[in-house]
């Protein structure tokens, strides 16, 4: 199993997906938006903690800058009814620290505001992750509280919303309601998701 990859980003155009060149071999890697927007554009080397899923027709690689985020991903996919895609959506819609707080506080209502999470799934997450979440107490660093190094455009934020399943028109409409200012793409996405979930 692949647990770590270190190389250069050669393709980073679609939010949540990138190609990592490791010694001349290009690996397709899926990431959470938290990780994706912390990786700066360019040819600088980057290391990713990898979770590998082997299927009959595919080898799927999920990459994380932070080892704790990978551990949280692994805990999520152990929950009945939560697959890798939904786990990535959760980690893209809320910071690991905020998610852990929801579980500690048994705040299933807030979890239902995340894309793809219904009432039953939210309650299942709270019940099944109460014990496993203890390993993260104090371990999820401020990495995910930091903004990405550079300001990203509204277009990138809209592309990310589309990747999460929202229609382009809907994404544009909600983005126009947000004061762009000097906010990072990640901040724009968070605010957009808050608006969309409050409807």
Swiss-Prot record:
Location of region: Flexible linker: 144-148
Compartments (UniProt record): Cytoplasm
A Pfam family that the UniProt record links to this protein: RuvA_C
Xref: SMART domains: HhH1 (SM00278)
Location of region: Domain I: 1-65
Record GO biological process: DNA recombination; DNA repair
Entry keyword set: Cytoplasm, DNA damage, DNA recombination, DNA repair, DNA-binding
GO CC aspect terms: cytoplasm; Holliday junction helicase complex; Holliday junction resolvase complex
Span list, region Domain II: 66-144
Principal localisation: cytoplasm
GO molecular function, one term: four-way junction DNA binding
Origin: domain of life: Bacteria
Region of interest called Domain III, as start-end residue ranges on this chain: 149-199
Domain remarks in the Swiss-Prot or TrEMBL record: Has three domains with a flexible linker between the domains II and III and assumes an 'L' shape. Domain III is highly mobile and contacts RuvB.
Function: The RuvA-RuvB-RuvC complex processes Holliday junction (HJ) DNA during genetic recombination and DNA repair, while the RuvA-RuvB complex plays an important role in the rescue of blocked DNA replication forks via replication fork reversal (RFR). RuvA specifically binds to HJ cruciform DNA, conferring on it an open structure. The RuvB hexamer acts as an ATP-dependent pump, pulling dsDNA into and through the RuvAB complex. HJ branch migration allows RuvC to scan DNA until it finds its consensus sequence, where it cleaves and resolves the cruciform DNA.
UniProt record similarity statement: Belongs to the RuvA family.
Subunit structure, as described in the record: Homotetramer. Forms an RuvA(8)-RuvB(12)-Holliday junction (HJ) complex. HJ DNA is sandwiched between 2 RuvA tetramers; dsDNA enters through RuvA and exits via RuvB. An RuvB hexamer assembles on each DNA strand where it exits the tetramer. Each RuvB hexamer is contacted by two RuvA subunits (via domain III) on 2 adjacent RuvB subunits; this complex drives branch migration. In the full resolvosome a probable DNA-RuvA(4)-RuvB(12)-RuvC(2) complex forms which resolves the HJ.
Name under which the protein is recorded: Holliday junction branch migration complex subunit RuvA
UniProt source species: Legionella pneumophila subsp. pneumophila (strain Philadelphia 1 / ATCC 33152 / DSM 7513)
